[in-house]
Amino acid sequence: MSIRIASHAGFCFGVQRAVDRLEKALEGARGTNRKVYTLGRIIHNSHYIEHVKSLGAEEISRGDIPEIIKRADEGDEITVVIRAHGELKEISDSLYSCAERNPAFTLIDGTCPYVRKVRDIARENSGDGRIFLLLGNAAHPEVEGIMSCAEGEKYVFPDEKSLENAKISLNSANFCAKTLSVAAQTTQNLAEWKKSINFIKKVYTNALIFDTICNVTQMRQEECSALAKESDVMIVIGCRDSSNSMKLYDIARTSCKRTYFIEGIEDCPKIDVTDLKVSITAGASTPYSLIQEVYKTMNEQNENFAELLESSLKTLNTGDIVEGVITSISPNEIHVDLGTKTT
């Protein structure tokens, strides 16, 4: 058995940047009256969420913001951390405004620089005479934040098929009379993006195309695809709420039928991987410590299988009478499986 860990598995730059800032804020607040809040889950990983909760982080929702700002204006020392996905423009604006006027309130904007770039594109390429299209999951926090930065006519599409269904609209006088700009959620499937762009170019030749899938996502997906083609078993670690993790799972199982999606070591498949090639990859919100735990667990399971096999084999002594199973017969010999260490 061989187990490989993908070189691009685990925290990406944007996630690492956000969690580093959160942990620094928690360290600074230790022993003080300052409260540290994350606006939503800082990352899509339940193991890490429990870790930062133990350090004092508390999770709030958008609906809590008015009360948080009110408390800060009354003198409470408060820090709010925006996650790597970014936040709705109106929410961010109100938090920045509070931070500017109130020294007791600290805002840590952990929005990933790649996500910020897409938000800028949405703002600069929307409004009068323009239509903004975004490839992504409309319910994803990153997409919600990006679309809140776009003015006027704007649409989210999940895949090329949805564009085909909207072909009549794309060919309409309304679309043709306006400048069409197209971007993507930073963690989108690269293959789906290429198909979508090719389709748009066929029906709308003057579209402005912005390639906004982050390069780490591209490398992670390409490596996952290559490993899946070479592996007997693929393990994808992540959270089912994580867009990039689920896309890795979809990519892996295209080429490797024995692909398992797990969130932690408790989900590790109990399978015999003796003589098999196993590869492990993980989403951008997966701590490397968890990847190492899964690697260790898979190795230990394989050792246990080997020990069980060894203990199940009998040792024969001269004069023993045993039962066996004939496995093959040829003109010159008969093969019998005696369930022993030697034949």
Predicted regions mapped to residue ranges:
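The feature marks the mature, well-folded catalytic cores of soluble enzymes
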Residues: M1-N299
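Single-stranded RNA-binding regions, centering on S1/OB-family and related RNA-binding modules
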Residues: E300-T343
